[in-house]
């Protein structure tokens, strides 16, 4: 590693430890020439994930964009922001582990809905209404009835 002070490429590692939840390694180094100490981080290089939008356009996956959408859907539901951050991290990890580097926005939306359904029914409905482009009250009623059937009798209030 090149010394930022002397530009020498010879250094020794003084200390190494996991950082960023185990996704990187933090190393404290010392230049063998000038004894300047500096820190480096080593991370696995990830190939960007391309999202295929509904209209066919492609864009790079943006965790901040997804997190923003989740925060909007989960406003005033009592869900902790750290849970949403974890959801996005886990989703991104699943996408990185796939063999293909392209994923449809529809697939991302469905993966998010599976997780949201377990966290908050209100957040699920709010996210689904945007993601599935609900056009009116019938779309909400249909989704609620489907949830009610799958959850069993007496789970949700009667709809209709």
UniProtKB/Swiss-Prot annotation:
Any Gene Ontology biological process: negative regulation of DNA-templated transcription
Domain of life: Bacteria
A GO term, aspect molecular function: ATP binding
Residue intervals of the ATP-cone domain: 49-139
Entry keywords, A to Z: ATP-binding, DNA-binding, Nucleotide-binding, Repressor, Transcription, Transcription regulation
HAMAP family: NrdR
Family per record: Belongs to the NrdR family.
Protein function: Negatively regulates transcription of bacterial ribonucleotide reductase nrd genes and operons by binding to NrdR-boxes.
Protein name per the record: Transcriptional repressor NrdR
Organism annotation: Parasynechococcus marenigrum (strain WH8102)
